[in-house]
Amino acid sequence: MLARDELIKLAVDEYFIGCNKHDHSMVMSTMSDDCLMRFPAASFRYLGAQALSIHFTDFLGNFSDINFHDFVNIVDVESQSLVSYFKVFLTDHEGVEIKMQNCNIFHCNEDGLFKEIIIYNTKALDKGFHEGSD
């Protein structure tokens, strides 16, 4: 079972900072092979390591700058869950900026990896999100 600080580290220091660094391996190492990531408001859904890898290759490749920051985390150690509210600034290769304040809900499995990630975004998502979605 992960402690409070370990849950925050997994979400912020590994998952989000991995995205900021465009580090595909770092991001993928936070998720179980059967992880489900979904965007309820956008109908995007990625199930399993292969779909998630395709998604993150697309996402990281579509944005020259990714900046997740200003995290507020609520942790439930008993359920191995974390809610993270944050700002994210994305800049595509043409210089178009997208600024959002989003909320992710993370649920971990017994191995201390994300088994489910639920993402609530404040703006419509276009490029970087279609690949890998079923």
Show where each model-derived region lies:
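A beta-strand edge to alpha-helix "cap/lid" segment located at domain peripheries
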Residues: 2, 7, 53-134
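Generic secondary-structure boundary/loop-capping signal
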Residues: 34, 43, 95-97
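Acidic side chains
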Residues: 20-23, 39, 76, 104
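Secondary-structure boundary/capping signal
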Residues: 23, 35, 64-67
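Short, low-complexity N-terminal intrinsically disordered segments enriched in polar/charged residues
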Residues: 1-33
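Alpha-helix C-capping/helix-to-loop hinge sites
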Residues: 15-18, 38, 90
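Hydrophobic pocket/interface hotspot
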Residues: 15, 26-28, 35, 48, ...
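A short gly/proline-enriched turn/hairpin at secondary-structure junctions
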Residues: 36-47, 58-62
